[in-house]
């Protein structure tokens, strides 16, 4: 103790405080760089980067999650993930290969999955998954979830991005960063955590109301949303802001597939069953394993084929459309449009066939060795951004799959491979023995050229490349059918002032992508074509910004979870401290009254012993005094007897001598006999008097002791009453203090919720401001491009119109040359007026667009503020209701406590009265025993009594 004070004075470091907490699965004594070699970067997560690592000894690959921590407290946030990974041992859950904490960085080494995440595969293939693939993934996910839930764990962040694929066609559930490890299977949680689009309604409600916690069935809802995501590339409500989607989930009906006809009834029924807003009726993972949608799934061939397609070699071929020559456009007859497009389509067909043939060595003569299969078209109804829908009309359709056997041994497998890649949307496929038809019409729909341009497109080849899905690369969307009116190529929309479809395609490129891979020994080649433009960059930018928003939300959730955990820990400590103080106060009061009772009993014992000693002395003195008096009386009595004897002798002496002797003898005998009788009677009387006197003394002593015992008993009972009264007061005060503490903790809880909600609202407003600013910038950029293109287009159109006007004058001449020049001059003036009107109309349209966009942005802000105010108001209502319920519960507890206090008081008084009766009965029995002629040797209950003189 002295050394501690000395150390405090000298401000020496406290080594006990710096003692680091040891974790079971985290090594602090080893540099991970000595064991693992970083060979690449896989991605950037919300809390750190993920690297591809290789074990220097075993060569095992791992995904290294490297997280920088500022202090030891942050390290605690990741322990649940490490413990879950270390505890779980299942075929469909990633394994923990090791974890290290070195130089302020936490390294989590996780099993590497070469197939990558499912969402990355969908972006790479630019399509959603087919139903057989979804069935297989769903089956494996359900088995993994069944194991997780049996281990009392909730994933809480199920989505396609957290489902990894191996080369063997198996899935691995990953990312347990926000998972919960429970003590009981049915344990509920109230943390608002996860990714909004995949959140269950009961999890969403926990943002403002903690009264309805959720359990493991929240994962079932996330599973259903993940299946929709895999079918449609994006989850439901993906077009909404991550914060605003929460309100949609809570208030709207469960989502469904956007194209019901594409999917089987079993799939629809499975989603309807899993996406039940009532968690009580929502089935568990084990129950869903018996659903017809996944019950008959056997094997993982669809996933093996999917991974093979995603990991295929890719040849990207970019065709850039040239500018339109104004002179050619004006001089070319309209009848040449179809000719030019047809010729170009035939040329492109041969060009494409040449490159595909070089890539896969196709033999056109062998009709049995190739098949042309149109893969399913991507559904853009739920596309993320409205700009995509504008360009759906210019995307091409053809997807070509060419199957070539690697050797003659694989000839029987051609048909099965073709069947596995049949068109899921239409339910049909071209058989392998059919000759592919000319793709001229399809190519025409893809590679349209502007009217009047006879120049062939410039081609760019990016070459074969190996694409890893886990690298997060995004590919372009598949081609779509188009229908357009070529006669409007040179026109300008009078209503909107926008450029024609032809002009919008002048600066676009056509991407033709060929994927080549092997399935069951059969080499498969898939070719897709699409029109790409600036919107591709916009889509990628919007996707990146959306991921950034989700990352910001994830960071907010993590910090909120940490603050919530700290507050919960603080509240638990406060409650434990208060209960400990209550116990100490109670024990202190009890100890005080127990010591008072002990002191009173000691004083009682001493007092009784002193009284008994005094009584013994008094009885002995009184007995001695009585005996002394009795001895004096006895001497006097003997003296009297002697006098009587002398008198008797004197009387006998008076008799004659002859009678004197006989008379003396008779008289003496008679006197001796009387003397003996009288003396015996006298002694007996003295003895009785002594016994009576001593008995009176004993009774007086006992009465005095009884009074003293009653006095002490009253004092004891008063102490007991005081002790119980103090205990009751303490109990009531403790109930009050406990209520005040719980009430204050509830206020602190809601204060933290309001604080976190305001932080979320600030982040929402910041994101909304960025979104509105981005929309305004895009609109201004588009308007600037339109303004820049308008003069050029007007010039080209004016030249064309002037040429046509001159030709009309030349065909039907009327008037002199001067009149024709005047007409041409008037036509030029009209063209200038028309162009000026077009410019004015465009300016007005742009101003109107800006006003509309500004109004839309303001409306978005108002809607956001209204939604935020509703959340705040709802939170305040919940707090008020919770406080009211808490007060009512406290009043009820006080009422019940007081009702229970009455029988406790009555029981105490009955017990005290019973003790009084026992004491009275005890002394009454002693008095009765004392009334017998023989002395009682029965020991006293309240005091000991011994008198040698009384015996």
UniProtKB/Swiss-Prot annotation:
Polar residues compositional bias, start-end: 331-343, 364-373, 429-443
InterPro entries: Kinase-like_dom_sf (IPR011009), PKK (IPR022165), Prot_kinase_dom (IPR000719), Protein_kinase_ATP_BS (IPR017441), Ser/Thr_kinase_AS (IPR008271), STE20_Ser/Thr_Kinases (IPR051585), STK10_STKc (IPR042743)
Sites of Phosphoserine modification: 483, 487, 491
Region entry Disordered, spans: 319-479, 785-804, 930-951
Organism whose genome encodes this protein: Xenopus tropicalis
Comp. bias regions, Basic and acidic residues: 345-356, 374-394, 410-427, 785-800
Catalyzed chemical reaction(s): L-seryl-[protein] + ATP = O-phospho-L-seryl-[protein] + ADP + H(+); L-threonyl-[protein] + ATP = O-phospho-L-threonyl-[protein] + ADP + H(+)
Protein name per its UniProtKB record: Serine/threonine-protein kinase 10
Subcellular location: Cell membrane
A biological process term (GO) from this entry: regulation of lymphocyte migration
Gene3D superfamilies tied to this protein: Phosphorylase Kinase, domain 1 (3.30.200.20), Transferase(Phosphotransferase) domain 1 (1.10.510.10)
Catalytic class of the enzyme: transferase
MF annotations from Gene Ontology: ATP binding; protein homodimerization activity; protein serine kinase activity; protein serine/threonine kinase activity
Similarity section: Belongs to the protein kinase superfamily. STE Ser/Thr protein kinase family. STE20 subfamily.
Post-translational modification: Autophosphorylates. Phosphorylated by plk1/plx1, suggesting the existence of a feedback loop with plk1/plx1. activation of the protein.
Keywords recorded for this protein, A-Z: ATP-binding, Cell cycle, Cell membrane, Coiled coil, Kinase, Membrane, Nucleotide-binding, Phosphoprotein, Serine/threonine-protein kinase, Transferase
A Pfam entry, by short name: Pkinase
Domain Protein kinase: from-to ranges: 36-294
Location, primary (coarse class): membrane
SUPFAM superfamilies attached to this UniProt entry: Protein kinase-like (PK-like) (SSF56112)
Binding site for ATP: 42-50, 65
Active-site residue numbers: 157 (proton acceptor)
Function: May act as a polo kinase kinase by mediating phosphorylation of plk1/plx1 and subsequent activation of plk1/plx1 during oocyte maturation.
EC number: 2.7.11.1
């Amino acid at each position: 103790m002295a050394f501690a004070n000395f150390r405090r004075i000298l401000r020496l470091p406290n080594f006990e405080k710096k003692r680091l907490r040891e974790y079971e699965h985290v090594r602090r004594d080893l540099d991970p760089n000595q064991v693992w070699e970083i060979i690449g970067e896989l991605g950037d997560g919300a809390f750190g980067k993920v690297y591809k690592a290789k074990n220097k000894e075993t060569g095992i690959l791992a995904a290294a999650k490297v997280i920088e921590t500022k202090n030891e407290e942050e390290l605690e946030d990741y322990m649940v993930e490490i413990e879950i990974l270390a505890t779980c041992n299942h075929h469909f859950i990633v394994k923990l290969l090791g974890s290290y904490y070195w130089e302020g960085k936490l390294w989590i080494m996780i099993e590497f999955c070469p197939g990558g995440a499912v969402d990355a595969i969908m972006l790479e293939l630019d399509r959603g998954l087919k139903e057989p693939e979804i069935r297989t993934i769903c089956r494996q996910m359900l088995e993994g979830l069944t194991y997780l839930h049996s281990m009392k764990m909730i994933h809480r962040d199920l989505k396609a991005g957290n489902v990894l694929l191996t080369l063997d066609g198996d899935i691995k559930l990953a990312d347990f960063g926000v998972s919960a490890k429970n003590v009981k299977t049915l344990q509920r949680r109230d943390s608002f955590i996860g990714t909004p689009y995949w959140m269950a309604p009961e999890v969403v409600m926990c943002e403002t109301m903690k009264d309805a916690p959720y359990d493991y069935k929240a994962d079932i809802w996330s599973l259903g949303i993940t299946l929709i995501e895999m079918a449609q590339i994006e989850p439901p409500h993906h077009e909404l802001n991550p914060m605003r989607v929460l309100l949609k989930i809570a208030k709207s009906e469960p989502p469904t597939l956007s194209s019901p006809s594409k999917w089987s009834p079993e799939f629809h029924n499975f989603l309807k069953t899993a996406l039940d807003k009532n968690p009580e009726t929502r089935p568990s993972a084990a129950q869903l394993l018996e659903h017809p949608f996944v019950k008959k799934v056997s094997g993982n061939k669809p996933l093996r084929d999917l991974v093979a397609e995603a990991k295929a070699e890719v040849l990207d071929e970019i065709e850039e459309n040239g500018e339109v020559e104004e002179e050619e456009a004006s001089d070319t007859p309209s009848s040449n449009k179809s000719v030019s497009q047809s010729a170009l389509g035939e040329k492109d067909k041969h060009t494409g066939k040449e490159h595909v043939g070089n890539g896969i060595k196709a033999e056109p003569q062998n009709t049995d060795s190739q098949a042309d299969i149109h893969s399913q078209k991507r559904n853009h109804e739920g596309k993320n951004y409205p700009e995509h829908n504008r360009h759906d009309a210019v995307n091409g359709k053809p997807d070509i799959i060419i199957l070539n056997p690697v050797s003659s041994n694989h000839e029987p497998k051609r048909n099965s491979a073709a069947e596995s890649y049949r068109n899921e949307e239409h339910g049909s496929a071209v058989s392998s023995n059919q000759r592919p038809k000319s793709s001229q019409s399809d190519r025409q729909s893809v590679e349209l050229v502007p009217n009047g341009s006879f120049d062939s497109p410039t081609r760019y080849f990016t070459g074969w490349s190996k694409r890893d899905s886990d690298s997060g690369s995004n590919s372009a969307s598949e081609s779509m059918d188009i229908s357009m009116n070529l006669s409007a190529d040179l026109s300008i929309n009078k209503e909107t002032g926008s450029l024609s479809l032809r002009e919008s395609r002048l600066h676009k490129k056509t991407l033709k992508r060929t994927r080549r891979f092997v399935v069951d020994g059969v080499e498969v080649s898939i070719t897709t074509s699409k029109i790409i433009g600036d919107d591709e960059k916009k889509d990628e930018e919007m996707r990146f910004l959306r991921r950034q928003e989700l990352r910001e939300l994830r960071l907010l959730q993590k910090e909120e979870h940490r603050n919530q955990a700290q507050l919960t820990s603080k509240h638990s400590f406060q409650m434990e401290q208060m209960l400990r103080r209550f116990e100490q106060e109670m024990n202190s009061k009890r100890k005080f009254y127990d010591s008072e009772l002990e002191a009173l009993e000691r004083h009682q014992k001493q007092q009784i012993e002193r009284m008994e000693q005094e009584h013994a002395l008094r009885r002995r003195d009184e007995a001695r005094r009585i005996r002394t008096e009795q001895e004096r009386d006895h001497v006097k009595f003997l003296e009297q007897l002697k006098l009587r004897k002398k008198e008797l002798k004197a009387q006998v002496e008076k008799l004659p001598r002859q009678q004197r002797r006989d008379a003396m003898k008779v008289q003496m005998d008679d006197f001796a006999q009387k003397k003996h009788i009288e003396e015996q009677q006298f002694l007996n009387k003295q003895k009785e008097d002594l016994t009576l006197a001593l008995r009176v003394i004993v009774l007086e002593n006992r009465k005095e002791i009884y009074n003293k015992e009653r006095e002490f008993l009253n004092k004891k009972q008063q102490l007991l009453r005081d002790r119980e009264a103090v205990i009751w007061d303490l109990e009531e005060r403790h109930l009050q203090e406990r209520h005040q503490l719980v009430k204050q903790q509830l206020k602190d809880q809601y204060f933290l919720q309001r604080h976190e909600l305001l932080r979320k609202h600030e982040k929402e407003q910041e994101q909304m401001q960025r979104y509105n600013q981005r929309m305004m910038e895009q609109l201004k950029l588009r308007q600037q491009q339109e303004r820049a293109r308008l003069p050029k287009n007007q010039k080209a159109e004016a030249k064309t119109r002037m040429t046509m006007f001159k030709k009309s004058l030349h065909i039907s001449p009327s008037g002199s040359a001067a009149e024709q020049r005047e007409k041409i001059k008037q036509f030029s003036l009209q063209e200038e007026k028309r162009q000026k009107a077009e410019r004015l109309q465009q300016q007005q349209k742009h101003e109107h667009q800006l006003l509309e966009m500004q109004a839309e942005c303001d409306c978005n802000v108002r809607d956001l503020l209204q939604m935020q105010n509703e959340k705040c108001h709802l939170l305040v209502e919940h707090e008020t209701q919770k406080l009211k319920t808490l007060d009512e519960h406290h009043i009820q507890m006080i009422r019940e406590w007081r009702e229970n206090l009455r029988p406790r008081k009555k029981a105490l008084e009955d017990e005290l009265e019973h003790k009084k009766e026992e004491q009275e009965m005890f002394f009454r029995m002693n008095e009765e025993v004392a009334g017998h002629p023989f002395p009682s040797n029965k020991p006293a209950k309240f005091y000991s009594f011994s008198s040698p003189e009384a015996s």
